[in-house]
Amino acid sequence: MARIPFEELPDHGRLWIFPCSRTLSGREAEVFIETVYSFLDDWKAHGLPLRCAGELRDSQFLIVGVDVDSELPSGCSIDSLVNRLRTLGSDIGISLIDHTPVWYREGADIQSVSRSQFRALAKAGTVTLATKVFDTSLTRIHDLRTGDLERPASDMWHGRVFFQDQVTA
């Protein structure tokens, strides 16, 4: 078994974030993460097991990390992960591969809207520079550990793109 607890991965480890197109229900989340764990238990690169970890945050974000000191993930191993997630998503009626929406927190809930919809929400003042948004493009475990996944829009690229008139250089 190559899967390890997430906290055992080094800060410089490789990270992937897969946003679920909707929040998973309790039982659905359990089945989902068990299926992911089953895949990660056997995940290999060039026949060698990858020391890896996975977790589901907020029943919405699948986080997968790899200890690159142990074995580097190959293009084929990454493709196998993406293909498995695409199939799993299809089986339960969600998308896990689409990073184009903007993910933001509204109270206790996580919302997902198109970029044009988020721009309209920003223009209307419904979302602000203080709105917490999610950066699903993180690639290092360190960034996840320092809280870069969820931060105010003012601290992310979202602030520059959607609040241009409110952000100073």
What are these regions, as identified by a protein language model?
Residues 1-16:
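N-terminal catalytic cores of peptidoglycan-degrading enzymes
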Residues 12-58:
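Long, hydrophobic N-terminal alpha-helical segment
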Residues 21-24, 67-73:
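A generic structural motif
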Residues 50-53, 91-101:
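Short, flexible active-site-proximal loops enriched in glycine and acidic residues
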Residues 69-96:
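Helix-adjacent hinge/juxtasegments
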Residues 97-169:
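Terminal interaction module
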